[in-house]
Amino acid sequence: QYRRLSHISDAAFFRLMMQHLPVDRALYLDSDMVITQSLHDLFSLDMRGYPVAAVQDSFLARTEWNHPTGLHTTPYFNSGMLLVDLAQWREHNIAAQLLQTATTIDKSVPYGDQCFLNTVFQKNWLQLEESWNFQTGAVEYFQKRNLSEVFPKPDTVPPVIHYTTRAKPWLCDYGEIPFIEVYWQYYCADWPEA
């Protein structure tokens, strides 16, 4: 029922109910990501009392934009990778807060559930370095406009590559996508039977 960007699926909203999982900590990862190294250091990170740890949205942090709830004045995270303190979510009934936000926010939520999460956790989230959710869409956007200095592609492969926007490696109608070769390396790898 919400208007959002076409590449954001209904399934993205499922993470709003994470507090019902029978664990105290969870690491949520979008399905359009490639993990290139162990996430042990990320998962065992000291969250310093925050209910969620995430990476700032790389595109929105570097552009002028208007968020339907007025969050353009505060750091806004990308919800593709979330380290979540579920015990704290249950204690504060975050699911109810998210659902309440969903009923009161404007029906135009360009970034789907990410808008609700940023509204509820405004100024109450731990900001992680960009390599934990390296968002390829930002690099592609700025490179096309000869502004690669705004958000350069790193020299090393980040631990988490997030193929944000509609430009996905498996969709052949898009041009140069940062770290597309990493996606194809994993796609073409021989995977042992489980």
Spans of model-derived segments:
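Short aromatic/hydrophobic "clamp" motif used to bind/position activated sugar donors
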Residues: 26
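Active-site-proximal specificity loops/subdomain of glycosyltransferases
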Residues: 1-20
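Conserved donor-nucleotide/metal-binding helix-loop-beta segment in metal-dependent transferases, i.e.
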Residues: 33-67
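Catalytic metal- and UDP-sugar-binding loop of GT-A-like glycosyltransferases, i.e.
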Residues: 29
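A recurrent flexible, glycine/aromatic-enriched loop bordering the glycosyltransferase active site
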Residues: 70-81
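Short, charged, surface-exposed secondary-structure boundary motifs
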Residues: 2-3, 61-66, 137-138
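Short, P/G- and charge-enriched loop/turn segments at secondary-structure junctions
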Residues: 4-7, 66-72, 146-150
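A glycosyltransferase accessory/donor-loop signature
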Residues: 84-194
